[in-house]
């Protein structure tokens, strides 16, 4: 699994590739919390378009990122979920907790500051 961060205007996109499972979900959690809590980024989008598989520990990392963002009044969105990842979130009844977008354009539009 690989994680990289890039800044687009007022938001940070974390690009994740590979599987998110028990062996590496702490890395995802750390990257999310680094952006939200340490760097104070108020708009974070997690790009899951290159993620093949996510297990319950990966879902827990996403929930922790969501909780941290809500605690600090930040926005945290997901985009690019494949059918498998979407189904994992749906079965766990967590899909409705997240703002989920099909692609980066939609996610960035949702995070754009209102004028």
Stretches found by the model and what they are:
Residues 22-98:
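Amphipathic alpha-helical interaction surfaces in cytosolic regulatory modules
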Residues 100-115:
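A charged, well-structured terminal subsegment
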Residues 1-5, 33, 55, 108:
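Short low-complexity stretches enriched in small and charged residues
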Residues 4-6, 79, 101:
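General small-molecule cofactor/ligand-binding pocket signal
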């Amino acid at each position: 699994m690989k994680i990289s961060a890039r800044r687009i205007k007022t938001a940070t996109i974390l690009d994740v590739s590979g599987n998110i499972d028990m062996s590496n979900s702490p890395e995802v959690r750390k990257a999310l919390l680094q952006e939200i809590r340490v760097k104070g980024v108020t708009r974070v989008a997690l790009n899951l378009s290159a993620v093949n598989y996510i297990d319950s520990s990966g879902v827990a990392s996403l929930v922790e990122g969501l909780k941290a963002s809500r605690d600090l009044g930040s926005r945290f969105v997901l985009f690019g979920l494949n059918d498998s990842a979407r189904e994992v979130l749906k079965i766990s009844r967590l899909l409705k907790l997240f703002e989920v977008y099909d692609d980066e354009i939609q996610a960035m539009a949702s995070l754009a500051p209102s004028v």
